[in-house]
């Protein structure tokens, strides 16, 4: 559910059920804790149609619950409008980045800055690996990476 604000960020992964909804929920919590949530429009999306209409992966939801973060999202695919209306589109891996750059080239009024979320990681882990075929500890790794990256992104754009 996108929020209205003066800045906007869209988190993107392949299916929009693991990494990007975790990043979205983490960032929502950070901006809420900083009392700047009114300044942000935040959402997440997929490059593919594989999981459209599905809730986040239960393992990701369990991981977020453990950290006291609520997740409320239904998977959707990125749209042409997203490229024109979001300031930042932050994705998880090189495949996402290639797909997004290819799609953005088909949008005349693309204003979004498309980057890897991992480019903000102070620990320099550029890629946020897909935990879909992994276990609970893989989801924890994704959470920790998203937390570090989202904090750094917020500091840079705040």
UniProtKB/Swiss-Prot annotation:
SUPFAM superfamilies: Phosphotyrosine protein phosphatases I. The keyword Cytoplasm applies. GO terms for cellular component: cytoplasm; cytoplasmic side of plasma membrane; cytosol; sarcolemma; synapse. It is an enzyme of class 3 (hydrolase). The active site is at 13 (nucleophile), 19, 130 (proton donor). It comes from the Eukaryota. Its EC number is 3.1.3.48, 3.1.3.2. Transmembrane segments: none annotated. One of its GO terms (molecular function) is SH3 domain binding. Keywords: Acetylation, Cytoplasm, Hydrolase, Phosphoprotein, Protein phosphatase. Inhibited by sulfhydryl reagents. GO terms for biological process: chemical synaptic transmission. This is Low molecular weight phosphotyrosine protein phosphatase. PANTHER family: LOW MOLECULAR WEIGHT PHOSPHOTYROSINE PROTEIN PHOSPHATASE, LOW MOLECULAR WEIGHT PROTEIN TYROSINE PHOSPHATASE. InterPro entries: LMW_PTPase (IPR050438), Ptyr_pPase (IPR023485), Ptyr_pPase_sf (IPR036196), Tyr_Pase_low_mol_wt_mml (IPR002115), Tyr_phospatase_low_mol_wt (IPR017867). Signal peptide: none annotated. Its main location: cytoplasm. Acts on tyrosine phosphorylated proteins, low-MW aryl phosphates and natural and synthetic acyl phosphates with differences in substrate specificity between isoform 1 and isoform 2. It catalyses: O-phospho-L-tyrosyl-[protein] + H2O = L-tyrosyl-[protein] + phosphate; a phosphate monoester + H2O = an alcohol + phosphate. The modification Phosphotyrosine is found at residues 132-133. Belongs to the low molecular weight phosphotyrosine protein phosphatase family. Interacts with EPHA2; dephosphorylates EPHA2. Interacts with EPHB1.
């Amino acid at each position: 559910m996108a929020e209205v604000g003066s800045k906007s960020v869209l988190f993107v992964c392949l299916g929009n059920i693991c990494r990007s909804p975790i990043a979205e929920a983490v960032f929502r919590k950070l901006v809420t804790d900083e009392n700047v949530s009114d300044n942000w429009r935040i959402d997440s999306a997929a490059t593919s149609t594989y999981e459209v209409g599905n809730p986040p992966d239960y393992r990701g939801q369990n991981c977020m619950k453990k950290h006291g973060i609520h997740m409320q999202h239904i998977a959707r695919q990125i749209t042409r409008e997203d490229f024109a209306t979001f300031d930042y589109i932050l994705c998880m891996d090189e495949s996402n980045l290639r797909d997004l750059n290819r799609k953005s080239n088909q949008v005349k009024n693309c204003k979004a800055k498309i980057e890897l979320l991992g480019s903000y990681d102070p620990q320099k882990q550029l890629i946020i690996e897909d935990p879909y075929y992994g276990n609970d500890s893989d989801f924890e790794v994704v959470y920790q990476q998203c937390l570090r990256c989202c904090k750094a992104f917020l500091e840079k754009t705040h």
